[in-house]
A protein has these predicted regions:
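Q-loop/switch helix immediately C-terminal to the Walker
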Residues: 102, 108-121
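Conserved Walker
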Residues: 58-59
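Conserved structural motif at the start of ABC-family nucleotide-binding domains
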Residues: 19-21, 34
Length: 133
């Protein structure tokens, strides 16, 4: 696994974790991608995930945002276990998202489907969303 490194930019005494991963494990096609990963991200911290290609850095972000669901473990955001939250609910309620390093669209969707997917994250009211796309 890559190295998880935290950089503190300000000191906030007594702050609770904003994002907490507990014992996250993920396997895919008999390959263990993440194995028992746990860490807290507190207010005022910046988190850097360092490591070579293929060790699971992007996978961790995909799990936090709800794009992937781990086989085991908990994801706590603002003291709520969000493991079963849909992507749209997680994104809108907690104002959390992820922009991948290689483009920000889904290759297997049409342009309109991509816009609707982003719209679902940003605009909960379907009538308003559809009128804008």
């Amino acid at each position: 696994m890559g190295i998880i490194k935290k950089f503190r930019i300000k000191s906030f005494k007594g702050t609770k974790p904003i994002i907490k991963l507990e014992k996250i494990s993920l396997s895919f096609k008999k390959r263990q991608i993440l194995d028992n990963i746990s860490f807290n991200l507190n207010q005022g911290q910046i988190l850097g995930l360092l490591g070579p290609n293929g060790v699971g850095k992007s996978t961790i972000f995909n799990i936090i945002t709800g794009l992937l669901k781990p086989n085991y473990g908990s994801i706590i955001i603002d003291n709520e276990n969000v493991i079963n939250y849909p992507i749209a609910s997680r994104s809108s309620k907690f104002k959390i998202g992820y922009v991948p390093q290689y483009g920000g669209y889904f290759h297997d969707l049409t342009l309109i489907e991509n816009l609707k997917a982003i719209g679902e994250i940003q605009i909960e009211d379907m009538k308003i969303r559809n009128s804008r796309i």
